[in-house]
Amino acid sequence: MPPPPHQKPENVLKRAHELIGVNQAPAALTLLHEHITSKRSRNVPIASLEPVMVLLVEQAVEQKKGKLAKDALYQYKNIAQNTNVGTIELVLKKFIELAAEKVTAAQQKADEVQSSIEATTGSSSVEDLEASETPESILLATVSGEQSKDRTDRAIVTPWLKFLWEAYRTVLDILRNNARLELLYQSTAMQAFDFCLKYARKTEFRRLCELLRNHVQTAAKYSAQMHAINLNDPDTLQRHLETRFQQLNVAVELELWQEAFRSVEDIHTLLSLSKRPAKNIMMANYYEKLTRIFLVGENYLFHAAAWSRYYNLLRQSAAMLATGQSKKSDSPPVSEADLQKAATFVVLSALSIPVISTSRSRGAMVDFDEARKNKNSRLTHLLGLSQAPTRSSLFRDVLSKALLRRASPQIRDLYNILEVDFHPLSICQKISPILAQVGADEEMQKYILPLQQVILTRLFQQLSQVYETVDLEFVQSLAQFPEPFQVTRGTIEKFIMNGNKKGDLAIRMDHATGVLSFDVDVFSSAKAVHAGSAAGSAENESGSVQRLQSTPSQIVRSQLTRLAEVLYTTCRYIDPSFNEARINARDAVLARAKAGAEKEHLEILSRKEVIQKRKDKASEIQAQKEKELARKKMLQEQALQQAEAQRLAEEQKIREQKRMAAEREEIKKKEVEGMLKDMKLDDVELEDLDNLDSNKIRMIKLQQLEREKNTIAEKLRVTGKRLDHLERAFRKEEAKKLPEDYAKQRERDIAAYELIKAQTLKEAELKHKEDVELKHRLTRLMPFYESFRADLHERRRDMFEKRRRDAERELEKQVTLRRKEYRERKLREKREREEKERALREAEERAEREKEEEKQRQEARKEELARLREEREKERERAKEAQARQQQREEEAMARRRAEKAAAAAVPIREREPFAATGSGPRLPLAGTKSTWREREAAKAAGGGAPSDSGPPPARAAPPPIERTDSRDRPAAGPPRLALAGNKPSWREREAAKNAAGGAPPPERSGPPPRVASGRGEPMDRAGSGRGGDRDARDNNGPAPEPLKASGGPGKYVPKFRREG
């Protein structure tokens, strides 16, 4: 079955509106979807396809058909992305706007429903005021009353929220990894973040973050595709950074700390790819969010490090703004209050870092330590630090940058109490008012608990140095904090147990007596734990705890060390050989070091050179690889662009051809429709228009004209007949009323005339009176007018005369100037005319000279040709003379040969039998059987006359070999004759033989008769042909011919020496 015919977008749009008008919106949506997803729609102009897509989006949103909209949007993006990106942005924005409007409308509807429910509940009458609250009503209110709003939202708002979320995800999937649509992609991601924040959609926010993360990975993987985004582009990377910072802000606002931390990692990854440094305002936001993330995760060490980085950035931004090195828009707003607040939090967060280990257990395994190291390394990289921070390094940084002077006074006092002059017995009394001030601040209140842990750690560490046992009540009295931060006994016990578990404390507690016993085992190695348990703490740092005195266990642990030191000192002072051996060993070591220092230095230098060469070579290889990859990528992109351009050109050409064909068809159809409309043929269906051609339309038109002509003629006949009777009746009745009507009309005309006449006379009289009054009033002003006019004329006369004289002078000046210009122009024209005449005359003279020269050259050429002609004539005469001499020599040679032949003919030969006696047939004229004229002439010369027929013919000698003629012996004209043996003599030879014989007829021979072609009759008479007879007659009648010259034809062989003589 053939596919259905493809409809135009205008017809599809019209049909869809018709379906929507009759409440068939699903059918309209299906029609629009099928048209968009059809393969034939790829060649349709985008301008006509855009309204179809907009209507499809509207209907898809109305009917919640997200999948249909997604499919159509993907297809529309593939169609329009290479020609018009703006239409894609328009359709996608429309899609999101409609979905957002639906969510807003659903929210308003839910609010209205909830308010109506509350109003109905509030206005309901209560039957019994004393028993208004029944058990049933309480249960119903508990189960359904408080949840009514949630149920309303789930029923009305949630479906549209889900649809809007799907719309955002669809649009982001369509726009991903496309450089042309990158701006819309970023703005859509921002709108999606605002959607998650506005409606507190935490689950959707996690999915959105994962979706954007996958998009970035896909972009890096498929970077070679056409129109793919380039993360190495600074602008593209900057836009992705802005999106990730917005993601971080929303994650913090929603308190999704895990997503916030992953967003921080994403930002750090993008920052590592960026070639340009990030803006200070963005980095300030980055570090500020890190402080909140680390505080929630109770990682106080990196929390303090983040505050330190934040303070350094603020101070750097302030310095750059003061020197003008940075724009105000690129830097965070920095004031003295901001710096003081940041310094306060740096010190407070550093004080809150736990002194002891924060690990969960003492027996940390190696794998756990490795994982912890990796985590600390990641966090260090996130903060941009070269090494992991420590509590002591942070305090050194605080002291080196004088943050204590900038911090608030209470935090400065807190630092002095905890780190400078810590005293366990008076610590709580000194620190209570400070903790009260810190607890009053909402932002600082979060540091109370870690500060308590630090205070308790220091308290127990110093108590263990002084006491062996201590009462728990005494410890509780020492650890007195202000309300509501009071520490209970259970808290202290829990702290002691955690410290023992992690190996930082060695305390035994007797619950029966309430006594705490510090570890007095002199061989205890509680502190000898691996360094991994101290990560993020300061228990292994010297000076972290103020040392009051050494404990017995510390004395026992250091006993061997002290013994070794004492023995070494004793030996050094008592035994001289010990010192000598030590000095000799040291000198030997120094000598060896000095001897090998130069060599080691050279080896180090050579190793450095080798390393540097290898680095340079590796960098060159890497640069070449990158250059080659860039070149290949560029060539690939160029090839793709060319292929794409060619494809687009072909598609455009095909679309243009189809469009023109469609336009022609449409014009033809409209012309047919217009003709049918002019003919008022409403019974022709639209489907029949394609079957109508010009002949059919002409026939229809002729038939229509014939019908109209007949109809009009019939109507005219009927109407004329009716009008004739009616007009006759009207005139009969009118003739009776005409006199009366005439009299009435005359009276009306006279009355109107009298009325107009009276009005005209009255108006003329009034106007005359007004004019007379005006004349009398103006007459009184005439003397003043005349005097003013005379004064004005006097004043203006002088001015007029002055202007007239000035005008005359100006006129004379202009006339003189014009005359001067006219003379100059005439002179210039005369000079130009003379110059042209001179140039023309020179051209004519030059042409004449050239003509004379050409004539002389032609005459010289003619003289040269005449001279050459004379030379050729002379050459030709010389050639003729040479030829004549050559002919004379040849004749002489021929005469000698004839004499030789005549002498040879006198020798007797065998007599031949006559032809008649043999009785055989005529002898064939074979080669060598017939004598030539030279032979006959030689025979005559030898015999003295013609031989008789009765006598036997002389014997013929064998034909001599054919003489070879060279190219110089050829005749002057024509190719050389073939020298064949026994050829028949030519007519010239025969004529020469006649002349030599004195005109006598040829002798009769007893031999065979002359050869006559059998069956040919008599020989041809050539008398009138000019080829033989006439010439014979002329030769016979004229003077005796000159001796014949050698013709250059074939003959007997003549030796060379005879030819020369």
Curated annotation (Swiss-Prot):
Primary site of residence: cytoplasm
UniProt xrefs under InterPro entries: EIF3A, eIF3a_PCI_TPR-like, PCI_dom
Ranges annotated as spanning the membrane: none
Subcellular location: Cytoplasm
Bias (Pro residues) ranges: 950-962, 1000-1011
Superkingdom of this protein's organism: Eukaryota
A single cellular component GO annotation: cytoplasmic stress granule
Residues in PCI domain copies: 339-523
Protein keywords: Coiled coil, Cytoplasm, Initiation factor, Protein biosynthesis, RNA-binding
Ranges of compositional bias, category Basic and acidic residues: 828-901
Compositional bias per record (Polar residues), positions renumbered to this chain: 114-126
Entries under PROSITE patterns matching the protein: PCI
GO biological process: formation of cytoplasmic translation initiation complex; translation reinitiation
Protein family membership: Belongs to the eIF-3 subunit A family.
HAMAP family, sorted: eIF3a (MF_03000)
Assembly and interaction partners: Component of the eukaryotic translation initiation factor 3 (eIF-3) complex.
Protein name, UniProt field: Eukaryotic translation initiation factor 3 subunit A
Native species: Chaetomium globosum (strain ATCC 6205 / CBS 148.51 / DSM 1962 / NBRC 6347 / NRRL 1970) (Soil fungus)
High-level lineage: Eukaryota, Fungi, Dikarya, Ascomycota, Pezizomycotina
GN (gene name): TIF32
